A protein has these predicted regions:
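Membrane-interface helix-loop junctions and terminal tails of multi-pass membrane proteins
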Residues: 1-121
């Protein structure tokens, strides 16, 4: 809404930008998977690099996926409230949040398999 105010737009809008294709859903799955896998891997291996790896993953998701990497349900809902190029139509939200949840779960499971915990509890 701050950006809307700066440009003299209505503070809350409903986006008309449909993002409902299967390809965009797959792109959102991939973007979320890569982001969460990057976070989990970096924190596990060397958390000093988190400030570099997370923005790199987000940038890659933006440039190299069909969804432009929302990768977060809160961002998805927020972007439904702008009719700018970055918006998402309200009817597309369910697909994106489902893809984000699936991507996050897949990244968590894969990282757990790749780097098993060796707890002796």
């Amino acid at each position: 809404t701050l950006a809307h105010a700066m440009f003299g737009l209505a503070l809350v809008q409903a986006s008309a930008h449909a993002r409902s294709s299967v390809g965009e859903g797959i792109g959102e799955f991939v973007a979320t998977f890569v982001l969460l896998f990057t976070i989990l891997g970096t924190v596990r291996r060397n958390s000093e690099f988190t400030a570099l790896t997370v923005p790199a993953a987000i940038t890659a998701g933006y440039w190299f996926t069909s969804s432009t990497s929302f990768a977060n349900p809160a961002i998805t809902v927020a972007r439904s409230l702008t009719d700018s190029f970055s918006g998402i139509a309200p009817e597309s939200i369910v697909l994106f949040i489902a893809a984000q949840c699936a991507g996050a779960l897949a990244a968590w499971l894969f990282s757990g398999w790749l780097w098993p915990s060796h707890s002796k509890d």
